[in-house]
């Protein structure tokens, strides 16, 4: 039997420990940095320790926080372990990237608290607790996006905050409407009260607005490309590992594992996901800012996850859950590579780069391998998960949706090849980086790349974990 205190440790170590970091910095900045990594590593270890029970044995681990239920099941543990692993690598990358900037205490506090809030959200089995942690991630991301304090940066941080918090308040109205029907905010009790009856369409739409705003999906996606003004570790954290995955996780938690929804809701999600995939991929094809291109790519790839979830088929949902891991590893690597390139060339304009593979061979190779996974090229993990998602879309009886996402996949190949050609191949067009990034930064990128490759080559292991999580979904709220 797994100790339920592991659940609390995964949440409270980073969420509360984060506030000790400025105090530790008074003694030593290096100690602060290592302590931040240790807090995230502790959360990761707690999540991994829950895997045998929640995934292999199929048991649910429960405890309470402020009297409200926390639940660790296959879905929650899979997402929590993925998020904490990638966050740990991002923290280590930050050691050198952030070293010469101001406000470092706030940076480490917010990043660490951000992860703790994510862990709390993932393990919440009560809508009020989920909402509280949802808002904490919004506050942390707001501070991190505006980290450099420039007027433009602050405006873009405010934009992200207003869109995501506004969406959250709309979602809260949906939660209250659910309470009005069931007289409870506990997910298990709501499911019992509904008894398989689909939630009201208005309730579904209100909750969906909040989900889409957090996951930067059309038509509330514009804040994510603008968030590229943040430090690269932050954009990697927001775009790959944690923030944008919150929305798809909550969708899976509420509408795959929890409550039924109508055919109208099903069609609405498919239409919005298809539009989001194509529009954002088209924007990525013409954009010249490397971080904005990768951000638009994230908007497009999140749409693939929504396709898999909305398909409602076992293969599609499994592919969607698996792609949370595969996209997180590969896209995290791409953003950190972009950070090294920007750090060394002092520009984000890909038309001012070129030929950087000669001076940054490890970064160039890492960018290529991570790109191949996002493109969905075999034997990388992105291939298997995307193939399952598209198969799920085909099985759902919407051939136009499948065709749209196949076209989106083609666009993905085109814009990622365009970046690689402009940045790393050919002759220098302007800014030429003099050398690779620091060992810590390059090592972090290499770690994500290796994990991305291994996850594809050894697909049976992560694929089996995702499959177990999906098989448990319809019975996880007890």
Where are the language model's segments positioned?
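Juxtamembrane helix-capping/reentrant segments at transmembrane boundaries
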Residues: 66-67, 234, 436-437
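Alpha-helical transmembrane segments and their helix-start/interface "positive-inside/aromatic belt" motifs
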Residues: 29-40, 155-165, 360-364, 438-447
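Transmembrane helix-loop-helix hairpins at membrane boundaries of multipass inner-membrane proteins
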Residues: 1-9, 15-109, 183-193, 467-476
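Hydrophobic transmembrane alpha-helices and their helix-loop junctions in integral membrane proteins
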Residues: 89-105, 113-130, 140-423
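Short phosphate-coordinating micro-motif centered on Lys-Gly-acidic
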Residues: 135
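Hydrophobic alpha-helical membrane-insertion segments
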Residues: 37-49, 167-175, 370, 447-461
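Short, aromatic-rich membrane-interface segments at the entry and exit
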Residues: 30-36, 128-132, 266-267, 464-465
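Cytoplasmic/organellar membrane-interface segments at the starts of transmembrane helices
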Residues: 357-363, 409, 413-478
């Amino acid at each position: 039997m797994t100790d339920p205190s592991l659940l609390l440790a995964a949440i409270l170590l980073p969420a509360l420990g984060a506030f000790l970091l400025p105090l530790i910095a008074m003694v030593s900045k290096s100690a602060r940095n290592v302590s931040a990594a240790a807090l995230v590593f502790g959360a990761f270890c707690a999540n991994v320790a829950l895997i045998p029970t929640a995934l292999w044995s199929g048991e649910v681990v429960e405890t309470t926080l402020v009297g409200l239920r926390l639940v660790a099941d296959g879905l929650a543990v899979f997402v929590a372990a993925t998020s904490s692993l990638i966050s740990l690598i991002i923290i280590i990358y930050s050691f050198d990237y952030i070293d010469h900037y101001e406000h470092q205490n706030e940076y480490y506090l917010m990043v660490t608290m951000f992860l703790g809030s994510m862990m709390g959200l993932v393990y919440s089995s009560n809508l009020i607790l989920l909402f509280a942690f949802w808002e904490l991630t919004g506050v942390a991301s707001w501070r991190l996006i505006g980290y450099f304090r420039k007027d433009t940066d602050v405006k873009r941080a405010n934009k992200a905050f207003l869109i995501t918090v506004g969406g959250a308040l709309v979602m809260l109205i949906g939660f209250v409407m659910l309470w009005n029907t069931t007289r409870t905010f506990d997910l298990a009790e709501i499911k019992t009260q509904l008894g398989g009856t689909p939630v009201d369409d208005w309730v579904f739409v209100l909750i969906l607005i909040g989900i889409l705003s957090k996951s930067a999906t059309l038509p509330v996606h514009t804040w994510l490309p603008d968030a590229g003004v943040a430090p690269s570790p932050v954009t990697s954290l927001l775009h790959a590992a944690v923030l944008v995955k919150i929305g798809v996780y909550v969708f899976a938690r509420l509408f795959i594992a929890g409550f039924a929804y109508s055919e109208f809701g099903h069609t609405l999600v498919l239409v919005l996901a298809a539009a989001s995939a194509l529009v954002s991929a088209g924007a990525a094809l013409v954009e010249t800012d490397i971080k904005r291109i990768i951000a638009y790519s994230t908007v497009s790839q999140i749409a693939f996850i929504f396709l898999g979830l909305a398909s409602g088929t076992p293969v599609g949902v499994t592919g969607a859950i698996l792609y949370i891991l595969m996209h997180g590893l590969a896209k995290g690597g791409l953003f950190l590579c972009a950070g090294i390139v920007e750090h060394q060339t002092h520009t984000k304009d890909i038309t001012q780069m070129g030929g950087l593979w000669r001076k940054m061979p490890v970064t160039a190779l890492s960018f290529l391998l991570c790109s191949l996974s996002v493109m969905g090229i075999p034997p990388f993990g992105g291939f298997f998960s995307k193939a399952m998602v598209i198969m799920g879309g085909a099985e759902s009886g919407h051939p136009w949706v499948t065709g749209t996402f196949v076209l989106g996949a083609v666009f993905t190949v085109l814009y990622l090849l365009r970046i690689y050609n402009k940045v790393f191949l050919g002759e220098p067009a302007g800014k030429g980086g003099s050398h690779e990034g620091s060992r810590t930064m390059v090592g972090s990128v290499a770690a994500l790349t290796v994990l991305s490759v291994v996850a594809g080559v050894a697909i049976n292991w992560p694929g089996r974990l995702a499959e177990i999580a999906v098989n448990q979904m319809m019975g996880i709220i007890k």
